A protein has these predicted regions:
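Residue-level recognition of single "structural anchor" positions
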Residues: 1-261
């Protein structure tokens, strides 16, 4: 606690962070952040509850809050620079029905990848007006942007990027100049394996925090930064409205044994 002699009021450095109003000790929170940063996969709620000695409800909410913190840290990441190659692609997370086009189902995720990290963003559709603002947000102007030949990317050069595309339908995965999207496609495989290995099937409404957690740790490894140090280096304001009503209902329905949060 901090005491101000001028206004004679007490304050806490935890105000505005995920630790505010929590009955769980700060040491327990930091230990869980260390566990998450050192794990290559998403931690299951049951493991956290057993390991920390808290209820499943508390474990669920702690994990959710830390993921929102990671999402806030990773939200403004800008990749690339003038002359550097950025790879952009989309993928589907979840079930995919047989066939193509309208027969598909699943969550659409846009990825922006470079040698310094990756950003993965859940998007509602693959329209140009959805894709371009995110690419502009996370790719530095003047970068080379490598994509497949999806028609929405055809006018990327008008945004100040130097665009190169590959025709995957004709099995063109690397251009004569050496440009490719192999990096982002490899990242998709890594992400999907991570979600499957822990039997994690987040609903589409709450998918983004899981994507941000995985992308944050992947980017830290790419840049040679300790994930835990990056996680506690800053505590931006959290918009808890992003934690949807669906998540709150999940807690009430599945973890009705009381909470320590």
């Amino acid at each position: 606690m901090i005491y101000c002699l001028k206004c004679q009021k007490r304050g806490s450095v935890l105000v505005g962070t995920i630790f505010e109003h929590s009955k769980i000790s700060l040491g327990t929170w930091l230990y869980l952040m260390l566990l998450m940063s050192n794990s290559s996969h998403t931690l299951p709620v049951s493991f956290v509850a057993r390991h920390l000695g808290v209820t499943a409800s508390s474990a669920f909410r702690m994990l959710a809050c830390i993921r929102l913190h990671i999402e806030a840290l990773h939200r403004g990441l800008v990749l690339g620079c003038s002359g550097e190659v950025i790879q952009v692609d989309e993928t589907l997370i979840g079930s995919v029905k047989a066939g193509k086009g309208g027969g598909r189902s699943g969550a659409i995720v846009l990825g922006v990848y470079s040698s310094k990290g990756v950003v993965a963003q859940h998007i509602p559709n693959r329209r140009r007006e959805t894709l371009f603002p995110l690419i502009q947000l996370h790719a530095a102007p003047g970068s080379w942007v490598a994509t497949d030949q999806f028609r929405a990317y055809s006018s990327l050069s008008k945004l100040g990027f130097r665009h190169v595309s590959m025709n995957h339908g004709r099995r063109e995965f690397v251009t004569a100049e050496g440009y490719s999207t192999v990096g982002i496609e490899g990242y998709w495989a890594n992400l999907k394996f991570s979600l499957r290995s822990c039997n994690i099937t987040p609903n589409f409404e709450n998918l983004q925090p899981y994507l941000s957690e995985h992308a944050f740790k992947f980017s830290c490894r790419k840049r040679g930064i300790a994930p835990f140090e990056a996680m506690i280096a800053d505590f931006p304001a959290i918009d808890f409205g992003k934690w949807s009503k669906r998540a709150a209902r999940d807690i009430e329905n599945h973890f009705s044994d009381g909470t320590e949060f």
